[in-house]
Structure formats: structure tokens, C-alpha cells
Amino acid sequence: ETNVIAGESGGITQHIGAYEVEVKDKKITFIDTPGHEAFTAMRARGAQVTDIVILIVAADDGLMPQTIEAIDHAKAASVPIIIAINKIDKPGADPDKIKNQLSDKNILVEDWGGKIQCAHISAKKGTGIDDLLDKILLEAEVLTLKAPKKCLAKGMVLESRLDKGLGPVGTVIIQQGTLKKGQIFVCGSQYSKVRDLLNERGESVDFAFPSDPVQILGFEKVPVSGESFVIYDEERDAKKISLERSRLEREAIHQMHSKITLDQISEEIKSGKASELNILIKGDVDGSIEALSDSLMNLSNDEVKVNIILKSVGMVNQNDIRLASASKAIVICFNVSSSVLGRKLSRELGVDIKHYSIIYEAIEEIRLALEGLLKPDIIEESVGTAEVRDLFKIPKIGMIAGCHINKGKVIRNSKLRLLREGEVIYEGHLTSLKRFKDDANEVLEGYECGIGIDNFKEFEVNDIIEVYENKEVKRKLK
């Protein structure tokens, strides 16, 4: 705890950006996420390495742009938040001002009627640190954070480096299982054997357990931050997975980035791979942004949902593009442009940026896209009716109804229902249609024909055959 307060975490801890604290016989592992942008990078790979986010806000500064950005990243990663208002010992400290600013971002702390815990601390003097640690333990207890130890280890690469003496080194946080020296692992497209394990103090250890940050030696190449680290019993299994991932990587190199466009997201929603349309809005003034955001949110219904992951004033920058890429969102610019670096990164990551100067055009384009995702209404449309006037038995076919077309037409393979004295006694398909001895595709009103129905031969004179078809009608948002 003293190290946390004073920042004296040691060279190794500062380097790997992770350290452990013992509190009431329980262990808390802190990951220095701002240092290596864990939220966006790991969210982009579908991972959730953090269980709880501690959002530290300076009591004398208020919400800074990077704090607001951190809130957006935490929400995008769906990780619970605990607020730590720091520097409460300073003369200009105003915790209530901070809480009010947080409420504007839909972050309501407990004493403001919300569910988010908040601690008042001074990292410099150590004030409130015990309370913050207690709140972390309470949140962990509510979330029932547990991980199995008696299984093969899995983890996530926090960061990596090429050490002159040690070679490729990956800092991994263990998420489940027990990691041992000598085990076979797969990380990204490489597989190898754990040569050594170093704890946060740089000491060699034989084991690493869930929530332990550990430096792993034995990589063939420097691993990528955010990659999964998985132990396998059999080397042949690890090798097989490694070869397959290598093949996929080679294919990806020869393909363009999968562009995150409105059409692509629409296809994912249609196929059931997604149920939300994520949108990031950038605009020139707050009023326009709020109006556009509210209008787009109102387009949501039970089938498709518009989710605004970020709305802010200003040009589109690189952080906006990273968040959009991680969340599979499109970017809407209202009366603003994109920075040069933002445009460059959007091309690299394949993020779609759409520009508008008229609010109704933006709303209408999103509305049309969402309407295209709605399942169509199915309506029944009558094609024709026929009256049974005679019965014929034809070799190899069976009973055929000699009919007169009273209305419309009848079409081979159409859906039909057979009525007798006003009651439906059978529903099926028109499988045989003849004019005299010849097969016919359709017979029009006023003509006579022979009709055969699948799995039905019990015709009676005066039966009525109704032929119909089901048509899809495009729905509109209400």
C-alpha cells in the first residue's frame, strides 16, 4: 500500500505497468491502463482483461478530455467503474463539482442517487486509500469475481518488449489456471515453451496464478499487446493451432481491411451477428449534437437499436477512430471535418466517416438503413379460386379434380386451401395442373382444368380451392 501511495513501485513494476497489493488477506492487481491504452487495444480483440476500472479524477481540475475519453473506453468495454476523486487536500478541491460533471456523462455516484462507488483520496498524503481499497474489495465481492486454478492457464498479453539479454518478453496477466515453467503455449500465431517466469520484482518464480502479472520468457518473437496466451497439454495441438493462425495471418495480409460501413453493419444485423448500430457523433456545437443524438436514439425499436457510443464537439481525431474501430461503429460528422491523422487512421482501420450539414439528411439515411433491417410483414394475397365439378382417376397420378376457374387464376406449385361447405379441410400445394391431357403452368379465369394436390385425394364435387401466395411487405419505423 505504501508503494501505491508513494508511487515507489520499482523499475520492473513501472515498466510492466502492473503491480499487486495485499489487502485483508486478499490480493488486488492494478494495471496501469493509461500507460498502454489497454481499453481500446484489448476491446478491439474482444477481450476484457480488467474486472473493475478505477477512474481517478483530480478534485481541482475537473473532468479533463482524457478523463472523458477514459469513461468512453470503459463503457465500450462494459467494465464497472469506481470513481476516485484525488487531491482532496488541495485548497481548490471541489468533489461535488466533479460529481456534477460526472452526472452529465451518466456517471451517478452513490451519494447522488446512483450505484457507482466513489472514494475521496489524496494519493500524496495517503488519505482515503484504505477506503478505496475496501470499495474495490466490495465491488469484487458483488461481482463474485472468481477464477479456477486447477486447469490449464489462460491469460492476456499486457505489453511486450525485446530485451537484449532475455530476448522477446511478454508481460501476461493470468486470467485462469496455474502457469508453470516448461509448459507449451500458443500466443497469437506462435507456439513455444515457457522458459522462465519473472514476477513484478523481476524474480524467477515457478508458478503464476489467476490475476498474477508475470513476465514470460520463451517467445519466438515479440508478442502483440492484447493477444491471448493459452497453455496446451500436447505440443501437436499447439502446433496445429499455430499453423492455422499463421495461415489466416498470411491471408489477411493480402486482403484489404474489412471496412466498417453502414452496409456491412446492416448485413451483420441481418445475419444475427449484431443487434445494434453503434454510432460515434462529432459536431460543431452541443445543441446540434444533442438534437441529432436524440433523434437517432428515437429510431430504436425492439428489433434494432441505435447506440451512441460517443458524442462530442470538435474534429474527428485518432482516439475517435480507435474507439469506433473497437466498437464497430460508424462516425457521423455534423458540420465538422476530420484531422489529417484521423483520416489516415480511418483508412488504415477501415472506419466509415459520414459527413452531413443538414440534420434531417443524417437522420433519414440512418432511418432507411434501419428500416432495411426490419423483418418484413408477411401478407396473404389471393391468386384465384376454382370449383370442383367432376372427379377423374388417372393411372400413376391418382385422383384429379376437374375444376372451373371462377376467379383470378391458378398456378402450379402455388399454396392452396380446400374448403367444403365454407370450412377449411386441407391446406397444401397445387402439384399437378392440366389442360386436357397437357401439363400447364397456369390456367386463367373462365377455363377448365384438372388439379392435383399433394397428399390429398378425397375431393368432392362443389369443393372450393383457394389459391394464394404470401408476399413480403417492407416495414417502416414508427
Features from the language model and the residues they span:
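P-loop/Walker A NTP-binding module and the surrounding RecA-like catalytic core of P-loop NTPases
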Residues: E1-E235, K239, N278-K282, D286-N298, ...
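Phosphate-interacting basic helix/loop segments used at nucleotide- and nucleic-acid interfaces
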Residues: E139, H257-K273, L277, G398-M399
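Charge-rich, low-complexity alpha-helical coiled-coil segments
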Residues: A238-I265, I269, E371, I378
